[in-house]
């Protein structure tokens, strides 16, 4: 049985029928694998986009951390409203929502950085 570390840092067993378990949000990865939704992965991706624009010194900025936290909350709340009983999301839907929240909150440069990174990763996957 596979284990996954959750956003709280605990290990969670993922059963083969995890995709059928009600009440949980799950993410379908590009390879078709279904994993537990992890808010921290969204937060890390947003922070990396901010660091790409603001520079590594932004990692110590309370302002940046607060903005990243709020943006992460905004992204997660969209999916919680859409699927209050849980459900499956495709990774692309999550990434699209991150882009949208960055733009709505007037972080155009960060959104551009995020989009360019997504495109770069897409090209790398296509070459593999």
Q: What are these model-predicted stretches?
A:
Residues 1-128:
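Extended catalytic cores of very large enzyme megasubunits
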């Amino acid at each position: 049985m596979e284990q996954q570390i959750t956003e709280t840092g605990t290990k969670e067993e993922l059963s083969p029928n995890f995709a059928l378990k009600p009440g949980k949000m799950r993410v379908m990865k590009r390879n078709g694998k279904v994993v537990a939704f992890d808010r921290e992965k969204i937060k890390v991706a947003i922070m990396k986009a901010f660091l790409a624009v603001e520079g590594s010194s932004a990692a110590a900025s309370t302002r940046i951390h607060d903005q990243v936290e709020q943006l992460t909350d905004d992204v997660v709340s969209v999916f919680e409203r859409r699927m209050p009983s849980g459900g499956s999301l495709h990774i692309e839907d999550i990434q699209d929502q991150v882009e949208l929240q960055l733009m709505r909150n007037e972080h155009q440069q960060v959104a551009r950085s995020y989009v360019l990174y997504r495109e770069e990763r897409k090209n790398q996957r296509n070459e593999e």
